[in-house]
């Protein structure tokens, strides 16, 4: 056992003697024989308040006894454990930027589809002014041209003029053949 030199005297003391001064609750060798045979812990403090507090004050500061309370970071710790458990189970609910963009794109598409499919009377009024069907169709075509069917005017515009001239001639030939 290592010996320590005391500041008060020039005599050296053993480690056990120093611990006995610091913690007066250590059993004496004479008491050890009696206490070995019986269970002596009563789950109470081994020394009353005030006794041994002078020796303890010299070595370290004792925290005041408080009722149990969760630590300040216990909620953070529990949240991290729950997060790890979800990750292990594969129930990771963390939303990534890719997931956000995908969800927003899907919501945008659904809104446009709903807008283009619905034919409500409120759509035909813009700021209290009557708006005809062609204006609404023009607006829809401008927003999403691939979603709106073309009308007869647009079909006539797309057909080249020479094929339109051939159609009446083709109709006349079967009529002449019947005569």
UniProtKB/Swiss-Prot annotation:
GO terms for cellular component: clathrin-coated pit. Residues 157-179 are annotated as: Disordered. The keyword Heme does not apply. It is found in: Membrane, Coated pit. One of its GO terms (biological process) is head development. The keyword Coiled coil applies. Keywords: Cilium biogenesis/degradation, Coated pit, Coiled coil, Membrane. Its main location: membrane. InterPro entries: CCDC32 (IPR028039). It holds the Pfam family CCDC32. It is a peripheral membrane protein. Residues 75-98 form a coiled coil. Residues 164-179 have a biased composition (Basic and acidic residues). Regulates clathrin-mediated endocytsois of cargos such as transferrin probably through the association and modulation of adaptor protein complex 2 (AP-2). Has a role in ciliogenesis. Required for proper cephalic and left/right axis development. Interacts with AP2S1; the interaction is direct and mediates association with adaptor protein complex 2 (AP-2). This is Coiled-coil domain-containing protein 32.
